[in-house]
Amino acid sequence: MKAIVYSQHGLPISNENSLYDTDVAKPQPGPRDLLVKINAIAVNPVDTKVRNGAPTETPRILGWDAVGVVEAVGAEVSLFKVGDAVFYAGDISRPGSYAEYGLVDERIAGHKPRSLSDADAAALPLTSLTAWEMLFDRLEVKKEEQAALLIVGAGGGVGSILTQLARKLTHLTVIGTASRPETQSWVKDLGAHHVINHHQPLAEQLAAIGQPTVRYVASLTHTDTYFPQLVEVLAPQGKLALIDDPATLDAMPLKRKAISLHWELMFTRSLFQTADMQRQHEILQQVSELVDNHTLKTTAGEHLGTISAANLRKAHALIESGQARGKIVLSGF
């Protein structure tokens, strides 16, 4: 089958060997696996991080967002059947979605939203799982509680879903941060009650909207830069969740306010085969339903054409430039 791989980490994306086309054997499903014929994928920042930073002894297939049709199932599969259209973010320890076929454990896949094209649906799994787990599993927000949530980087892939989930599924006051006018408009359109600029002091802006402290913070970008300000605006016994990778993070400033710190990584359940791994199937099923009843909308941005090394190099370059708006999707071979 066709696949796009890298075999030498850290090459600049302008180098044709940073991602290249090849042929590999079609995989065979294990007991809980679906063999999926992949129709569309999305590209995420994690793709570029792995390509740049993870050495590999054999050519590696990246990609952790996919939409396709189930072609075969393992002997113990019970949630899906051949012919089902599915979407998933996959398992970072297994070959990814830059290929004609892929394997995914049924416990971390969902039925694709019927109302979306394959490409638009491909934008959803990784960011939806991350946002949902952050909001309801890490921060443990109760849907009926009255409190405020500050989302730092609300216009990005995860932030765009998190803003929608918080506004549509909870009673939280949702405050998003964005710096560019077009991103501020985007975040407002997604449902944020307030949008403030993270390039200006947060405490002053929160006080100006009558919300001097917040119970919850979802820090999606540059946590180390904003950390002192986040501690300042968090209420006593508040909760801070993050997804990025600061080199170091001194947690001591959290002690005085008894603020709890929560890291979200949507790959954890599949990496460690946790007892609740099937929760990701359940989340994706709910996301699919919310999309089909028009509660959530896709965050697909740019469609870069077919799934090829040349187009994936363009996608990686866009992400590395910081200029991507919305999720980058590709479809077909």
Model-derived features: where do they sit?
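Glycine-rich beta-strand-centered segment in the early N-terminal region that forms part
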Residues: 25-42, 50-95, 108
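N-terminal Rossmann-like NAD(P) cofactor-binding module of classical short-chain dehydrogenase/reductase
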Residues: 87, 215-218
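NAD(P)H dinucleotide-binding glycine-rich loop of Rossmann-like/cofactor-binding domains
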Residues: 89-153
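Short, glycine/polar-rich helix-capping loops at beta-to-alpha or helix-loop-helix junctions
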Residues: 97-98, 179-186, 248-251
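Mid-domain Rossmann-like dinucleotide-binding core that forms the NAD(H)/NADP(H) cofactor-binding site
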Residues: 124-200
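Short amphipathic alpha-helix with an adjacent loop that forms part of the alpha/beta core around
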Residues: 201-212
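Glycine-rich phosphate-binding loop and adjacent beta-alpha segment
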Residues: 225-296, 332-333
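C-terminal capping/lid region of NAD(P)-dependent oxidoreductase domains
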Residues: 289-302, 313-333
